[in-house]
A protein has these predicted regions:
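Local pocket/hinge segments that shape ligand/substrate recognition
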Residues: 42, 129, 133, 264-354, ...
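C-terminal motif of bacterial Sec signal peptides marking the signal peptidase cleavage site
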Residues: 23-24
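Short helix-initiation/N-cap motifs at beta->coil->alpha
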Residues: 243-255, 270-271, 406-416
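A structural "hinge/loop" feature
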Residues: 43-60, 82-83, 109, 131, ...
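N-terminal lobe/hinge region of extracytoplasmic solute-binding protein
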Residues: 40-90, 206-209
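Gly/Pro-rich hinge or "lid" segments in bacterial periplasmic/extracellular proteins
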Residues: 142, 153-159, 163-164, 170-237, ...
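Detector for C-terminal structural segments
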Residues: 219, 316-345, 383-393, 415-531
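Aromatic- and charge-enriched surface segment that lines or borders ligand/interaction sites
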Residues: 85-135, 167, 256, 303
Length: 531
């Protein structure tokens, strides 16, 4: 799952004006002082269609509108939600999910197994063009259907046996398949709603959901409003109304929080220089995340088609300096799988070594940076991304003699650029979609649409496929270690920079908010304190 953010000044002023009007007018929501619970998304969600969404902002909205077969507990193990139980059969090659009888959609209709079958086949349908279709490729004939090798979706190994029973047939035992059921792309969808409204099915007047909140309104580029679902089968949320603002400027978002006009901020709304002050405040936390930041190289473009150049740029970065700039609990990283996840290994990766970096660059034909072409590092518009980019720009100039041009882009434009024509160097990040190393390692598979470097390595692909089939953890770790060495030491299409923690602050008049290690903002247990 990718992480942003960015927006224009005029929208910022409009959002601020809207907030001031709402503060003066809205007193009927049942939360503290009758106000809605207000959070800042920071930007417009690119999509609320969970077959198409790819980013942190979109998934944080969807996670409060929808639930799926499972969610993960505090130990990152899948636990039933719409599924009341499941059976793992045929040595792990067949899984049968048994659904609850009381799970309903917001229009009162029962959630049935066919809603999952439709959703998963829509995710795989090549016409949908989902970037996350590959997550289901372990299902029999799923990849073949997605690639157009078969056209009959009845041949795909997922089927509703009846309203309460969903059968999944896998090509082979798959170690991460149950954790995958916590990921929003596997959540059910209503065929009648999607087919009736087409691309507009996620608009407030059309969408039907099954989670704790309903989509009340969506003023694009401005705000999203949610209201409690009174018929949510796990119980109505304590707060009646939620407002999700889209204030891009960190300083403005923090000012609104200080004035009581926002109730929760995360990293994307907290200026770095304000973190020491806020750390003394009630409600401030650093929440460890299963998330990493990296710089990627367009390996099909000169000069980064030369692995020596990629290694030189990697070894010229002093990652240990970056956490002191960001002040948010970050941890420098040379490997890709994050701390807290199976197969994390801090010993993997290229160390900071300027003399070796200069030697490699000289060997590649650019002694002391002479003759090196003008290249650009692109990043999405956000304060912390700029600070890191400027720091690393200085390291490359100092250690390699190369001045890299910086370019910042608004989030939607940046994502489109990565997909269509990646810059020579680009910033990106990844947060866990489901709590398994497969989710991190598979990002750079040759078939992954989010492999923006366009790098391919057949041995790497083989290793991640073997690890997915392996059910013994120690053997999985060895396979992932070898894959990480190829990624971070041998071919180096990316440079891991740091693993993140999320700086958050919650209005102390509220309790129950959950911001978990998967980067999800969970609001269904939020309530106003009574004292």
């Amino acid at each position: 799952m990718t992480f942003p953010l960015g927006k224009s000044f005029c929208r910022l002023i409009f959002s601020l004006f809207s907030l001031l009007v709402l503060v003066s007018c809205d007193r009927s929501s049942g939360t503290a002082d009758g106000k809605p619970f207000r959070v800042n998304l920071g930007t417009e969600p690119p999509s609320l269609d969970w077959s198409l969404a790819t980013d942190h902002v979109s998934f944080n909205v969807i996670a409060n509108l929808m639930v799926g077969l499972a969610e993960f507990d505090k130990n990152l193990k899948p636990t039933p939600v719409i599924a009341k139980s499941w059976d793992v059969l045929d040595s792990g090659k067949r899984i049968v999910f048994h659904l609850r009888e009381d799970a309903t959609w917001s229009d009162g209709k029962k959630v049935v197994a066919g809603d999952f079958e439709f959703s998963w086949k829509r995710l795989l349908d090549p016409k949908t063009a989902s970037e996350y279709a590959y997550t289901l490729f372990d299902i029999v004939n799923a990849e073949e259907y997605n690639h157009g090798k078969i056209t009959d979706d009845k041949e795909v190994g997922v089927a509703a046996l009846d309203d309460s029973t969903l059968e999944v047939r896998l090509k082979s035992p798959t170690s991460y398949f149950l954790p995958l059921m916590t990921f929003e792309v596997t959540f059910p969808q209503r065929r009648d709603v999607v087919e009736k409204h087409g691309s507009k099915w996620t608009e407030p007047d059309n969408i039907i959901t099954n989670g704790p909140f309903l989509l009340s309104s969506w003023k694009h580029e401005n705000e999203i409003r949610l209201k409690a679902n009174p018929n949510f089968f796990l119980g109505k949320p304590a707060i009646d109304n939620v407002e999700m603002m889209m204030v891009n400027e960190m300083t403005t978002a923090l000012a609104l929080y200080d004035q009581g006009q926002l109730d929760f901020l995360d990293n994307h709304s907290i200026p770095i220089l304000e973190k020491p002050r806020l750390a003394k405040s009630q409600g401030f936390k650093h929440v460890p995340q299963l998330r990493g930041e990296y710089y990627g190289f367009a390996v099909n473009k000169k000069p980064f088609d030369d692995v020596r150049v990629r290694k030189a740029f990697a070894m010229a970065i002093d990652r240990s300096f970056l956490p002191s700039l960001l002040r948010g609990g970050e941890q420098a990283a040379t490997s890709w799988i994050p701390p807290g996840m199976l197969a994390y290994n801090a010993k993997i990766g290229l160390p900071y070594n300027p003399p070796e970096a200069r030697r490699l660059l000289r060997e590649a034909g650019y002694p002391d940076g002479k003759g090196f072409p003008q290249v650009t590092l692109a990043y999405n518009t956000l304060e912390d991304k700029k600070i890191v980019a400027e720091a690393i720009q200085g390291m490359w100039k100092r250690n390699l003699g190369v001045l890299v041009r910086l370019e910042n882009l608004e989030w939607k434009v940046f994502l489109k650029r990565l997909l269509n024509d990646p810059p020579p160097i680009f910033r990106s990040g990844w947060g866990a979609d489901y709590p398994d190393p497969d989710n991190f390692i598979k990002l750079f598979a040759s078939y992954s649409p989010q492999n923006y470097s366009r790098w391919k390595n057949s041995r790497y692909d083989q290793l991640l496929e073997q690890a997915a089939r392996e059910m013994i953890e120690q053997k999985r770790v060895r396979l992932y270690n070898e894959a990480q060495r190829i990624l971070c030491e041998v071919d180096v299409p990316i440079v891991p920079l740091f693993n993140t923690a999320e700086s958050t602050i919650l209005n102390p008049r509220y309790t129950g908010l959950e911001y978990n290690s998967m980067g999800r903002l969970v609001l269904r247990n939020v309530k106003a304190k009574t004292d």
